[in-house]
Amino acid sequence: MTRMAEKPISPTKTRTRFEDIQAHYDVSDDFFALFQDPTRTYSCAYFEPPELTLEEAQYAKVDLNLDKLDLKPGMTLLDIGCGWGTTMRRAVERFDVNVIGLTLSKNQHARCEQVLASIDTNRSRQVLLQGWEDFAEPVDRIVSIEAFEHFGHENYDDFFKRCFNIMPADGRMTVQSSVSYHPYEMAARGKKLSFETARFIKFIVTEIFPGGRLPSTEMMVEHGEKAGFTVPEPLSLRPHYIKTLRIWGDTLQSNKDKAIEVTSEEVYNRYMKYLRGCEHYFTDEMLDCSLVTYLKPGAAA
């Protein structure tokens, strides 16, 4: 496998990204537990078949990503933005692989270490408190589930180049991300960016995901192809995110008193606005969620 030379990164930029991530994910583990399922998975679930519980659908989503990677025992899987560790645990248990997780959240890092330590395996398991910009070790496969929203448009070329260079000739990667549409695309579908929509987007990127910026599916494809990947047709998960958000919102609402107790009424109201608002805009086809697969030449052949 080819190793990529380390690329210097601004200390200010790194510090800012740490602050942005921790502003959201380090609110309180107890708070997130009030609306997440037992897997502690904070991304779009996959309700296939439709009668799955949220927990079952979260495992189905993880499996949907992992099954696209052609994992073999002994391979090393890199999980960029590894959350609370469910994807890594699933990969070790299903495919007998080594795992490396990257996170910028101190709370997630601590929980991941506990999750990985509890797995009965001789495979290597590690979680690093760092971003992808500072990672250059060779790996066989890469998965990234809803971390891409935090990377920034200006960093997409560097991200895909780095991922391409640290994998072998048959490398595979999946990236799942919430996505938005270009105004021209919305106009073609009879939609337009209203003041209300713009205000909600501003709320999301300032109060919920500071520093976040949604890509379009086209951007995810084009930047991946520019780096040398072959990109099959992306998969839209929009109906599944609508259901996920509805369940999260209903569950948090049913735990209102506990949520206020572990955080504050202001935090509770902010997250209810976020969950209900996102459900609305996904339903209204203003937002989508794309699962994109990236194949190096040896995998695409």
UniProtKB/Swiss-Prot annotation:
**Which protein is depicted?**
Hydroxymycolate synthase MmaA4
The positions annotated for binding S-adenosyl-L-methionine are Y42, S43, G81, C82, G83, T103, L104, S105, K106, N107, Q108, W132, E133, I145
Gene that this sequence comes from: mmaA4
Catalytic class of the enzyme: transferase
Summarize subunit and interaction data from the UniProt record for this chain: Monomer.
Q: Which family does it belong to?
A: Belongs to the CFA/CMAS family.
Q: Which UniProt keywords apply?
A: Lipid biosynthesis, Lipid metabolism, Methyltransferase, S-adenosyl-L-methionine, Transferase
Q: Could you say which EC number(s) this protein's record lists?
A: 2.1.1.-
Q: Name the catalytic site residues.
A: C278
| Pathway the protein contributes to | Lipid metabolism; mycolic acid biosynthesis
Q: From which domain of life does this come?
A: Bacteria
Q: Which Pfam families does the entry link to? A: CMAS
Annotated function: Involved in the biosynthesis of hydroxymycolate, a common precursor of oxygenated mycolic acids (methoxy-mycolate and keto-mycolate). Probably transfers a methyl group from the S-adenosylmethionine (SAM) cofactor and, subsequently or simultaneously, a water molecule onto the double bound of ethylene substrates, leading to the formation of the hydroxylated product at the distal position. Involved in the activation of the antitubercular drug thiacetazone (TAC).
